[in-house]
Design a protein with these regions (language model features):
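Serine-centered coil/turn micro-motif
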Residues: 30, 130, 190-191
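Generic recognition of short, well-ordered alpha-helical interface segments
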Residues: 10, 14, 159, 163, ...
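Glycine-rich phosphate-binding loops that contact phosphosugars or nucleotide phosphates
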Residues: 40-176
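An N-terminal, well-structured beta->alpha segment
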Residues: 1-41
């Protein structure tokens, strides 16, 4: 096996180990269920917030939430600090904030704003003593994982955040009894909706 393939295999193995740690962590806390219950009763929308790679993960998580029945939009922390906070409906919306370290300075003013206006915050971090979790209503502590590629860029951590977000969206979908009929309404185009419509017509 050449060196490139060895690197590829090592990367995948490292990320599999990270996902295994995430899977095992679900049994150690009830906060995931608390987050599901809160989002399932949401009156407004879920604003998913992050900085850098965490924001990019948040874009996907937000899209999945909306796709499966939980209204959601994603914001970079920078945009929220420059007028985006006006998008938050007090007493209706919930913030879902992703940050590996939980110490990103861009989050500071956002978390203070949320606390001052009694806006619920679901904080997701890998650091138990982080600023993010201190300010969060629901504190989600994910396991510390080894980043693939000498820890030079978020890799394994981005993957477990994404997997956690998918788990949240699917659990909320089940809780809200989101079915094929509702899925078709929000997916008028694409192969998934077309396949479901064809099955429905046959039945």
């Amino acid at each position: 096996m050449n060196k490139d393939l060895q690197i590829a295999k090592k990367t995948v193995q490292t990320e599999i180990q990270a996902l295994t740690k995430l899977s095992k962590s679900f049994g150690r806390s009830s906060y995931f269920s608390t987050a599901v219950n809160l989002l399932s009763k949401i009156k407004g929308k879920c604003l998913v917030v992050g900085v850098g790679k965490s924001y990019l993960v948040g874009l996907k998580v937000s899209a999945t939430l909306s796709s499966l029945g939980t209204p959601s939009v994603a914001f970079s922390a920078n945009d929220l600090q420059h007028g985006g906070l006006g998008a938050i409906q007090k007493n209706h919306d919930i913030l879902l904030v992703f940050s590996v370290s939980g110490e990103s300075l861009e989050l500071n003013s956002i978390l203070k704003y949320a606390n001052e206006h009694k806006i619920s915050v679901i904080g997701v971090s890998c650091k138990s003593s982080s600023m993010l979790l201190r300010y969060s209503t629901i504190k989600i502590l994910l396991p510390k994982v080894i980043e693939a590629g000498h820890s030079l860029a978020p890799t394994s951590s981005s993957l477990i955040f994404l997997s956690w977000g998918d788990s949240l969206a699917i659990a909320c979908m089940r809780k809200q009894k989101w079915d094929n009929k509702k899925f078709i309404l929000t997916h008028p185009s694409g192969t998934l909706a077309t396949a479901l419509i064809q099955v429905k017509e046959i039945m």
